[in-house]
Amino acid sequence: MTEMTPTPTLDELPRRFSDFDTLGDALDYAAQGKRGFNFHDARGTLARAYPFRELREDALAAARRLIVAGIKPGDRVALIADTEPQFCALFFGAVYAGALPVPLPLPTSFGGRESYIDQIGVQLDSCDPAILLFPDEIAELAGAAGQSRAIAAYGWDDFGGQDAPDTPLPTANSGDIAYLQYSSGSTRFPHGVAVSHRALLHNLGSHAHGMLINDTDRCISWLPFYHDMGLVGCFLSMVANQVSTDFLKTADFARRPLSWLDLITRNPGTSCSFSPTFGYEICARRIGSQSNVQERFDLSRWRLAGNGADMIRPDVMQRFTDAFAPAGFDAKAFLPSYGLAEATLAVTLMPSGEGMEVELVEETELSGEKRSDGSRPKRFRAIVNCGKPVRDTLLEIRAENGAVLAEKTVGKVWMKGPAVMEGYYGDQEATDACLVDGWLDTGDMGYLSNGYLYIVGRAKDMIIINGKNHWPQDIEWAVEQLPGFKAGDIAAFAITTPGGEETPAVLVQCRTSDEIERLRLWNEIREKVRAITGMNCVIELVPPRTLPRTSSGKLSRAKARNLYLSGDIQPYAVAA
């Protein structure tokens, strides 16, 4: 059996940094070269090399099938986004047909059949697609979701077997909407972010320049295509900037996370690979105290280790560095960033090669509380530098009344630039609430220092007790300092007591069935949180795998709060 050859890193085709009018133009150009995508199985073995030339051929055929099926320019094409060549071809097929591809999440292990159908259903209601296309492996679930909304639904194989006769393709303009992107938290009231070709390609060029992409770079990714970092950063960007990419399915990464590092090791050139903090944490935990790190891995050519999509945890990144430094990993490769789907993707990037920088900020500066008189010890929090704005992007930190705040003052992060979304699809009210005079309210809290952005947390997650601001991450971090607890095991949020007072509640996933041990843990958690944060919190121990997550794997504090208050999360009884 002949060994499959991956698409090359080097190519004679001159690189263009996303300077195209439309996404279709970008693929037309990339297809003239030899680079492309490479899909790997759970063990990291190459299963399919997919040059951009083949992707374009398949996408044009998919476009013709869509047009024959009655799809018109502006129609929405819902795509369940698995990491497969078929998804890539269908996404670009929709683009060539003038339709709007709408990536939707795969089922996860959280929740059951009805939960998934409900989640997909509300997103289908929101985007009102003309067709739903899905991997054949989930035909029962996806078909039921389509049937519940009377939407024509086809498996990829079934649709791919239909005729694709020659038919004229529409001409796109740079101001047209290219696709809709649902943010990872948009389940109950989803907002489809409408991104134009112009905004997309400007952002793709901006972050390619910011990362100093060069001829020896190759991307390695396990990120899902239904999340903005995976879709925009590791799929569309690689086409528009002509970068060969090695893909590992998200589910395969979850089962065998070190396969990600195996792929980076095997890349003879320089690697650019991105992950939220939890990806680095899983790898550091999995390698544990193994002594063969340097024998299995060579991470010395990992040029950019991007981090974003969630709060960046410096303690986790340090553990990853300690675990993999023997394999040649250089902490200067870390590339902290900040972005959101409403800004296409990238808003800020740390300059390449500067690594991760952290500021220790006193609690009163984050909470807005008056400085202490020295009667209690100061408490500090490590805040990660998320870099400088990408080109043509402006940032302001604003108070609640809209006033622009000085440097090193925490407030709401607002941004303006050519990559800001057109709006939320079909929801003018929500659009008007966050887009004001061309400025986007990101919903995040942070501050500026010497032109660099520091993110403190989500405004909606803030816990306000007696007029003082508290960040749930600080409370959760306190619990994580105890043995046996990790990020994702804890959710902190505000509740109202029977007496009408606001107080923090802390849900902690507990793996022991011994009631005496639970009581010991309950007391230990309560005392640890009090010692670190100074707060008395309602501590609730809950069963494992209870805390809800978004489709991209992030903890959903808002959903956890709703489930707790509705009684759907039942804590263990602890005899305090």
Annotate each predicted stretch with a short phrase.
Residues 35, 153, 163-182, 188-189, ...:
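Conserved pre-ATP/AMP-binding loop-to-beta segment of ANL
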Residues 37-89, 109-116, 171, 192-201:
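Conserved AMP-binding/adenylate-forming core of the ANL superfamily
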Residues 96-163, 170, 276-277, 282, ...:
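Structural core segment of the AMP-binding/adenylate-forming
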Residues 201-218, 228-271, 286-292:
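Conserved AMP-binding/adenylation subdomain of ANL enzymes
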Residues 303-305, 312-452, 460-462:
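Conserved AMP-binding/adenylate-forming
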Residues 489, 493-494, 505-506, 526-576:
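Conserved C-terminal "lid"/linker of ANL adenylate-forming enzymes
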